Amino acid sequence: MIQIEIQNVKSRLIGDLDPKIISALHNKLSAEVVGSYYAQQRNPYWDGKKHFFTKKGMAFATGLVWMVREVLDKHHIEYEHVDLRVKPKEQSSLPLHNVTLRPYQEQVVNDSIEQQRAVIRISTGGGKTVCMAALVGKLNLTTLILIHRQEIMQQIKETLERILQVPVGMVGAGVVDIKPITISMIQSAHELKDFLPTVDVLMGDEGHHAPCETYWQVAQECKNAYYRYLWTGTDWREDNMSILLDGFAGKKRWDINASKLIQDGWLVPPEIFLYDFKHERKARKGISYSEIYGAEITNNYERNKLVVDIAMKAVKANKSTLILINYIEHGENLLKILEKVYPEAVFIHGSTEPEKRLKVLQEFKEGTRKLIISSNILGEGVDIPKLELLITARAEASTIAAYQALGRTLRLSEGKTKALIVDICDSGVKYLESHTNSRISVYSKEPLYKLVPVQNISQIIL
């Protein structure tokens, strides 16, 4: 009989397996590398895949045990589990304050503790951080939460301290303050060398980032982390590396989409105006994508003026408005036009001083500031319940980014009955048109998203 020897980070098979079964496992626990076709031309001996099962030692990430079992079951191989993990001693749970868990949140927390590790998707605005806090409090063990952005770190810290009423440590942005519950920017993980082996509960927020190398290095250093969870508010990764999410934290256990949350009254329904912006100039042969983006998006005065006109219509209607862009130059171009008609306009991005970014964001949350231009720092993870209108001006191709951006607007807020989004849908240029189609495909997956094609500003009803 085959033994599945399970440890916190790595597991392995012990026993004699037919080489064909080993090959089946090697193939199952793999993912095709994007762009591998070209690399294979240089190295014909490579199959173009990244493998997560070693043939020689029959080792694999513990989160993939369920996939190994599927292969063994398919080939009628008998096996038994040998669990070498040491479960942390149970502690009294921390009481929760200032929050009442929704039914699905209670189910997520209880199931996650029972399963010990999980990948959990709760659509943006569904109270993912509240679930995280409740799970941390119920386990009440040494916990590390990995994040990748300063604004998210501060937001999670404030939420955990409000709900659990205990101090929460932070590592990142020049701060090293380690406590039994600590939030760390993944870029600052080198500061945690002595803390990592003591961690019982390892979590990753915005879990679609987990396939990055640093996440994996930290996960492997947390040798005693019995409980492992990844949280995300977006659709699963759009490349083939979703298997890395499973390897980090186990099987995908929960998938609560936006339409379910809207139906149950936990999010407001969105109305998405798809503004058809026709580009007159045709892309020349041989021109790069960055050159197309620069000419047709970043430096396109007509398009930028349209974005500003839509924003000003919203300001006059007293709607709090966020304009999302990708590149600093684009934001600066928009700001130059906007400042002429709205001097209070502000543009924040990754290079903006942290104090200014947090101040502007706080003013926006409080409603004292009505209009912001922002790069991707506000496109993901940041909670802005009062946001009423989102203008996506960045011609984004990523479906994950589209999910995240839309989620900025769906949160409940007093007096808010629906979310408004204007997506500048570029047509007439091949690359940009394909990006438009990608975003529309994301919106179309949610049955309660209302899509409204428009061709002029008067059709945008605020």
What are these regions (language model features)?
Residues 52, 74, 80-121:
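Conserved pre-motif I regulatory segment
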Residues 115-136:
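Walker A/P-loop
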Residues 154, 166-177, 322, 332-336, ...:
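Conserved helicase ATPase core of P-loop NTP-dependent helicases/translocases
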Residues 161-194, 360:
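Inter-Walker segment of RecA-like/P-loop motor cores
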Residues 199-200, 373, 380-395, 420-423:
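A short beta-strand element within the Helicase C-terminal
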Residues 208-273, 443:
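Post-DEXD/H (motif II) to motif III coupling segment of the RecA-like Helicase ATP-binding lobe
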Residues 287-326, 332-337:
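Conserved interdomain hinge at the start of the Helicase C-terminal
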Residues 408-439:
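Conserved segment of the helicase C-terminal RecA-like domain
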